[in-house]
Amino acid sequence: MTALPQLISLLHLASPALPIGGFSYSQGLEAAIDCELVRDATTAERWIRDNLLHVQAQCEAPVWLLLHRAWQTQDHASVRQWNDWFHATRETSELRLETEQMGWSLAKLIAQMGWGDDASRDLLRDMRPVCLPTAFSSACVALGIAAREGLAAYLFNWAENQVAAAIKAVPLGQVAGQQMLLGLHQAVLGTVDEAVCRADAVPPLLSTFSPMLGVLSARHETQYSRLFRS
């Protein structure tokens, strides 16, 4: 069980109040709404769950774990490798800019808060770009947060942002949003388990195959009316 000081740090990192701009992105959800693939609470929850289990679980979540391990062992070459690999898998300019902006904002906050050792903060400062999984996993290691707990918080924060985007863009009520979040608890846990298995494999079992998400993200770049930056 996570010790209370680490739990407080974890809640801090996963808070929607963390000033990294997650509220301004929908990661293709707004385009899915525009195309009427998402129309109500049921289709919104299905979209978010499928994204967790078939996109996050196969790429971003296992890469997050690999980055956490690299930060723990101070393997800075592997940190750079997985940061660059993840950045290369972002299929559209919107998705690249999203992880760049949020990663840079969190890296800046880490420096200002003095989290971690000098070498780790210097590496975050020098990497261009620094992706969000890289910065978030670094903060977890700096604050003594274990990999599974840190990844669960990362994924729940992602799901929370998706639900908030659905509430605004579908639109949905606040109670419907909370019901969706409750329904996603098991999907978050399942994604963590799948990510651990994929990260533990030799070589890691990673897949970036998500063509519909890539197409919707590209469509969103020229969508006539938008609330979100992705």
UniProtKB/Swiss-Prot annotation:
It comes from the Bacteria. It is found in: Cytoplasm. Its main location: cytoplasm. The keyword Chaperone applies. InterPro entries: UreF, UreF_sf. It holds the Pfam family UreF. Keywords: Chaperone, Cytoplasm, Nickel insertion. GO terms for molecular function: nickel cation binding. GO terms for cellular component: cytoplasm. Required for maturation of urease via the functional incorporation of the urease nickel metallocenter. Belongs to the UreF family. UreD, UreF and UreG form a complex that acts as a GTP-hydrolysis-dependent molecular chaperone, activating the urease apoprotein by helping to assemble the nickel containing metallocenter of UreC. The UreE protein probably delivers the nickel. This is Urease accessory protein UreF.
